[in-house]
């Protein structure tokens, strides 16, 4: 659906050059929700603007739905952009137009008139849950409602791709979740390919199938969201994962556990979605004659499945403890004995 090959974006100002995007390769599939996460200055917003030709690469190619966006200009590019909707952090609504008129604006530009345009506007208002707000102006709307208008407007011309550039960054947590649920629903209903640019790992965890982590213009890590959360490889990825797993607090907790539970072994267990809800602990304890005390745990849900982390105290003979750890690994539970 979307292919980036060796994409570079370089800016020149007086005596220095800035490499905003540094030789990026990506393949994004039809119908997936793909996340790009990075801190400010990582290059993610520059990258997404090359998907619809708002920025042109200094080198490399950008292909969307078999069309080389990076090489077309003029009317061909304008036509291609009708198939690539975009929503923004600060909504970019026309403040002198009502909700219905804002949604109708791209249809006007595309030459859609009369009853056909009114029908499409009403259809989109229902899709994003803004019934009764048709004649309201942006100043009368909440932040979440404004973003719903932005989403409806972006979908007006039945695009195949929706670009979301920090679309929830200006919203409170509850409204963020409501907008994310709407994007999930739209993705499933329309089989729409959605690209999400964000610095919030909660957004990635909530709706994305795959994620690319950017730093200094490069994609430094790429994979299924569940895999990236389980085993983040790069330091920047580990920092992002800590946003939603409270790893800093867990480090303090580990020291407390090791200090307060001197007997047996303290073991960290990592459960995957297929065994996160199974009675593994009781089964292993019973079959190996050990006592497993659960000290701390959490469960994280992603679009690829759930994974859970448990910290347990294992009490028993040395042989029984080792046998229980072996059985846990056989049951596809990752184990890590914490050293005192």
From Swiss-Prot:
It comes from the Bacteria. It is an enzyme of class 7 (translocase). It is a peripheral membrane protein. One of its GO terms (cellular component) is plasma membrane. Pfam families: ABC_tran, NIL. GO terms for molecular function: ABC-type D-methionine transporter activity; ATP binding; ATP hydrolysis activity. Its EC number is 7.4.2.11. It is found in: Cell membrane. Residues 2-241 form the ABC transporter domain. ATP binds at residues 38-45. It catalyses: L-methionine(out) + ATP + H2O = L-methionine(in) + ADP + phosphate + H(+); D-methionine(out) + ATP + H2O = D-methionine(in) + ADP + phosphate + H(+). Keywords: Amino-acid transport, ATP-binding, Cell membrane, Membrane, Nucleotide-binding, Translocase, Transport. The complex is composed of two ATP-binding proteins (MetN), two transmembrane proteins (MetI) and a solute-binding protein (MetQ). Belongs to the ABC transporter superfamily. Methionine importer (TC 3.A.1.24) family. Part of the ABC transporter complex MetNIQ involved in methionine import. Responsible for energy coupling to the transport system. This is Methionine import ATP-binding protein MetN 2. It comes from Listeria monocytogenes serovar 1/2a (strain ATCC BAA-679 / EGD-e).
């Amino acid at each position: 659906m979307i292919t980036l090959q060796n994409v570079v974006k370089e800016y020149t100002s007086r005596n220095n050059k800035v490499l905003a995007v540094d030789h990026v390769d990506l393949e994004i599939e039809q119908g997936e929700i793909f996340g790009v996460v990075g801190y400010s200055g990582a290059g993610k917003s520059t990258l997404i603007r090359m998907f619809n030709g708002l920025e042109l690469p200094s080198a490399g190619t950008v292909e969307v739905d078999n069309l080389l966006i990076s090489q077309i200009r003029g009317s061909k590019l304008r036509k291609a952009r009708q198939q690539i909707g975009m929503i923004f952090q600060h909504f970019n609504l026309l403040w002198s137009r009502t909700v219905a008129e804002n949604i109708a604006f791209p249809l006007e530009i595309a030459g859609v008139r009369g009853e056909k345009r009114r029908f499409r506007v009403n259809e989109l208002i229902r899709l994003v849950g803004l019934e009764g707000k048709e004649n309201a102006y942006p100043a009368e709307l909440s932040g979440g409602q404004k973003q719903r208008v932005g989403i409806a407007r972006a979908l007006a011309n039945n695009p195949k791709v929706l670009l979301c550039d920090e679309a929830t960054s200006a919203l409170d947590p509850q409204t963020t979740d409501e907008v994310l649920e709407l994007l999930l629903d739209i993705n499933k209903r329309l089989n729409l390919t959605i690209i999400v640019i964000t610095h919030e790992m909660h957004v990635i965890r909530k709706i994305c199938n795959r994620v690319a982590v950017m730093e200094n213009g490069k994609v430094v890590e790429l994979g299924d969201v569940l895999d990236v959360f389980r085993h983040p490889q790069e330091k920047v990825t580990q920092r992002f994962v800590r946003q939603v797993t409270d790893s800093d607090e867990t480090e303090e907790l580990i020291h407390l556990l090791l200090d307060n539970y001197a007997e047996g072994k303290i073991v960290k267990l990592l459960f995957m979605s297929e065994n996160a809800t199974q009675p593994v602990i009781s089964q292993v304890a019973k079959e190996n004659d050990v006592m497993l005390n659960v000290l701390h745990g959490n469960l994280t849900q992603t679009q690829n499945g759930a994974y859970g982390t448990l910290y347990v105290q294992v009490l028993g003979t040395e042989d029984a403890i080792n046998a229980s750890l072996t059985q846990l690994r056989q049951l596809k539970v990752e184990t890590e004995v914490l050293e005192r």
